[in-house]
Amino acid sequence: MQASKYDPQGLLDKLDKFQLDAFNKAMRLGSMCIFGDTGFGKTRVATAIMMELFATGKIKTVLICGPKSALEVWPQELSLFTCPIRVTYLNYERAPSLVDIKLPSYDLIIADESHRLKNRNSVQSKILWRLGRKAKYRLALSGTPQGNSVEDYFAQFRFVDPEVFGGNFKEFATAFMLPCGWMNKKWEINPDKEDLFNSIIHEYSYRITKEEALTLPPITIHRVPFELHGDAREAYEKMVEEHLLEINDTEIDATLAITLVGKLQQICSGFIYGEELNIFESLDKVATLLKILPTEKVVIFCKYEAEIQLLRAVLKNRFILIYTGETKNKEIWKEFQNTDKYDVFLANLKTGGTGLNLQSACKLIFFSTGYSYLDFYQARDRVYRRGQTKPVDIYCLYAKGTIEESIYEVLDEKGKSAKQVLDDYRLKLLPQKK
C-alpha cells in the first residue's frame, strides 16, 4: 500500500467517536493511559497522538516499547504516513540489557501492552520508569491493565505520571490499599478509599469496552463440569491427602504450593509429569471435550504440552493446526484464520492466547487454564473481537470438587474486581438512557 501524504487532520478524520475522545483527552493531559478494550484501535489512536505532537513541533523522537508480537504491528501502521519522525523500538525482553548503561532520551515513549509492566519490581518496569522520567510525553496502552489485583495499576501509572500515585509503592498502599490473602501478601482496595482510587484511575486514563465501541454478536460462557473417576480420582485424592499438612502450614514454600497446584491440574487432565509422563486410564476430561466438540472451526487452549499431544492423538480425524512456543512459523495461524485447511486450532495458552486474530472460529474451548485473569481474558478475545459476525460460545472444562473448580472461582473474582475499577465506576457516572 502506498504511504499517504502526512496529514494529521486526515488521520483524525479516520478516527471514530471513541477514538477521537481518547485522542482529545491525551492531547489535554499530555501523558495518559489508554485502556481501550481489544479491537478499540489503541495503536491507531497512539499514532494520531504521535503525528499531532510532531506536526505541532512538540516532539521529534519516539520510543515504542512492547512485546515482540505488539511491536510487529507498529511499522505497518506508521508506513501509511510519510512522516520524518524518528522512531525506535524496544522489546520488553531486551530491557534488562539497559540496566548498566546511560539511558537515552526520547520526546515521547509509548508502552504498548503496559500490563507487562505491572510487576513494579521487574527490570522491565524499572527501566521504563527511568526512561519515562526523561520523556516529555508518555502513553501506556492496554486492554487488560488489571490481571490479578488493583496493585497492577501502580507500576503503569508510575511510568505515565509518578505524581498520580507517587513513585513509592509503600505510600501508595498506605493511601489506598488493605493487605489480604495468604499471609497478607496481597492487596485490595480500602473500601473507604474506593471511589477516590477509581476517580484517579479514570482522571488519567481513557477506558472503553468492546461492547460500547463495537457492534458484536452475543457471547456465552459455558462452564462444563465433569466427574473425575478411576485411577485419576485415586491419584488426585492421594496427592491432596499427602500434602494436606503442608497446605495448612503457614510456612509452606510458595514454589511447593505452585508445584502442587500444577500437579493436581495435570491429574484432572488425565496425566501427571514425573520421572516419566504417566497417562491415566480414566480420561474424563478428554471424554467431556469429545461430547461438546463442534464439527465447525474451533479453538482449543491448553496449559500443558502433554495436553496438546494427548488431544492431537485423540483428534486425529480432524484437521489440526498446533501452535506452541516450538512453532517456528509464527504466522501459520493465518492459515487457520484465512483458509479452510484446518478446523481445529490447538494452542498453548501462553503462546496462542495473545496477538492472534482467530475470529473465523466462533467456538473456543479452555481445556485448561491458570489463575491469570489476564491470560484467560486475552485468550478469550482471540475469537471475540472486531470482525466476529457469529454468536460466540466459550467452553470451560473443569473437574468438579477439584482445584480446577477453584481456579474458575478465582478468575470470576478477579474479573469482578477489574470490572469494578475499569467499568462500573465509570458507567455509573454516565448519563442514564431513558
Regions found by a protein language model. Give the residues of each.
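Conserved P-loop NTPase motor "coupling/switch" region that bridges the ATPase
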Residues: 61, 108, 125-212, 388-391
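Charged, low-complexity
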Residues: 1-32, 76, 80-87, 91-93, ...
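Conserved Helicase C-terminal RecA-like lobe
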Residues: 1-2, 13, 28-31, 37-41, ...
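SF2 helicase motor core recognition
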Residues: 96-100, 147-150, 306-312, 330-333, ...
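A conserved SF2-helicase RecA2
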Residues: 371-434
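Walker B catalytic acidic pair
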Residues: 112-113
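Conserved helix/coil segment N-terminal to the catalytic DExD/H
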Residues: 92-108, 119, 130
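Conserved helix-turn-beta segment of the N-terminal RecA-like "Helicase ATP-binding" lobe
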Residues: 69-87, 160-163, 317
